Amino acid sequence: MIKTKHHLLIILLILISACGYEPLNKGFPESNIKIFKKTFSGDNQINRKIFNKINLRETKDELGYELKLNSNKIIDQVAKDKSGNVTKYKTTITIVVELIENQKTVKSKSFSKNFNYSNLSNKFELKKYQEDIETNLINSIAREIKIFLN
């Protein structure tokens, strides 16, 4: 009876450990998409960060794709107090991705993320916080673009 319980426990542990769990990002193969031309419009700093994060291979021959990135960043004042001072902001980043082959759009999609946050009394800290928010939004959008292109 005790040996049966031990055998059952061992089999159960083997099955659980071999269930095939792996992180979502681990399963992404390296992208086979080769880019021979990239065109950026809008906020070039955001476009460069996105392009670097999606890890596409660049090639010299025209056998690859053309990638167009159009980005836009908006910082809105969402709320003000009675004296007219801003109390809340919203940062929105929108990126339109186009993958073109032989002057025909193969894939196209718009990605948008936003984040609401309170104003800080120290403007230096506020600027730094806004940069951190921008980086986080860019990372999130880059993950979505990578999934879209694969």
For the regions a language model picked out, list residue spans one by one.
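Bacterial N-terminal signal peptides that target proteins for export
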Residues: 1-8
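Post-signal peptide N-terminal segment of mature Sec-exported envelope proteins
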Residues: 29-49
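Surface-exposed short loop/turn segments
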Residues: 51-52, 62-108, 112-131, 139, ...
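Sec-exported extracytoplasmic/periplasmic mature domains
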Residues: 55, 59, 142, 146-150
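Bacterial signal peptide processing site
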Residues: 20-22
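C-terminal motif of bacterial Sec signal peptides marking the signal peptidase cleavage site
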Residues: 15-18
